[in-house]
């Protein structure tokens, strides 16, 4: 990939040309009236524009004429440091989808943004309202859908969910270790409790996962944190190896020969070789063009799947063998 820039700070373009001479042009113009216009022209000549307005708006026009407009407005406590946004999508045939968000916050001390006593978020999608009410005293969220279904969530002082209540279902409780990592998820209570747990090794990676039936899957890692062994509940093992670039080079199922993988110089899969099954050829090969797009897949039976692209690199079709 080669990059060529021209112009100045007021108006400049960057051409990105691939190994197959497919060029995309990125144009940035700082408008005299304010705002910023960004234009992307792909190798096929299709144009996508983004207009950044002084009113914190973003208007994206797609090649098919679809217009997506996002406007931002300040959060009642944190202003534009944590903006809220509205979204309008207009299709070429005039269909319009709108997403509106509002937030109200009640403070016990107007001069202290952290003296929150209540907060209500409303999300209105094409006239259908979703509500989220937060009670800081109870650390409780109550979410209501347009159909009136409610989910109640309790959090701790760190913002981690502790309990979730859904109408008609057993409560779900979440537990964490001193490092803030999830250690268990429990639904129900007593004899009907369904408990799943997670343990970690000294390096912080998941060491085991245990399901409600007390079936445990264990994991072992190499020094770089890659899984080298998965131990199933019946103590059978799945082994993994990697090449020098970190690509999976083999997977060995329990009691079976290895499945091997090879890669190109740019880490694209070039070959999959399953265990021998008595055929003259049992590997699957993958081929790519200089832009890293797949051009063909050669199956073990020698037949190929071909991928064809237009001059801009978009997939036109793929041809399946019928032998």
Question: Can you annotate each of these PLM segments?
Answer:
Residues 1-42, 46-62, 66-211, 215-232, ...:
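Beta-strand elements of repeat-based all-beta scaffolds
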């Amino acid at each position: 990939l080669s990059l060529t820039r021209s112009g100045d700070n007021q108006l400049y373009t960057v051409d990105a040309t691939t190994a197959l001479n497919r060029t995309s042009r990125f144009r940035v113009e700082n408008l005299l009236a304010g705002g910023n216009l960004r234009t992307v022209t792909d190798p096929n000549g299709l144009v996508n524009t983004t207009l950044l307005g002084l009113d914190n708006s973003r208007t994206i026009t797609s090649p098919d004429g679809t217009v997506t407009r996002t406007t931002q407005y300040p959060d009642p406590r944190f202003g534009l440091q944590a903006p809220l946004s509205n979204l309008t999508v207009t299709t070429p045939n005039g269909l319009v989808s709108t997403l509106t968000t509002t937030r109200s916050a009640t403070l016990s001390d107007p001069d202290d943004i952290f003296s929150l006593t209540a907060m209500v978020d409303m999300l209105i999608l094409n006239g259908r309202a979703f509500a989220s009410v937060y009670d800081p005293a109870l650390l409780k969220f109550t979410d209501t859908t347009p159909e009136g279904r409610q989910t109640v969530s309790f959090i701790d002082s760190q913002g981690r969910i502790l309990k979730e209540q859904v109408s008609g279902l057993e409560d779900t409780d979440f537990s964490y270790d001193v490092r803030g990592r999830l250690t268990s998820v429990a639904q129900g209570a007593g004899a009907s409790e369904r408990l799943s747990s997670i343990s970690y090794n000294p390096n912080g990676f998941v060491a085991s996962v245990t399901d409600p039936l007390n079936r445990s899957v264990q994991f072992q890692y190499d020094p770089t944190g890659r899984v080298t062994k998965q131990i199933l509940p019946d103590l059978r093992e799945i082994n993994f190896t990697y090449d020098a670039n970190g690509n999976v080079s083999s997977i060995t199922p329990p009691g079976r020969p290895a499945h091997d993988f090879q890669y190109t110089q740019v880490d694209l899969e070039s070959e999959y070789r399953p265990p021998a099954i008595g055929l003259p050829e049992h590997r699957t090969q993958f081929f790519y063009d200089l832009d890293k797009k797949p051009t063909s897949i050669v199956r073990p039976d020698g037949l190929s799947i071909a991928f064809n692209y237009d001059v801009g690199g978009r997939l036109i079709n793929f041809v399946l063998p019928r032998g």
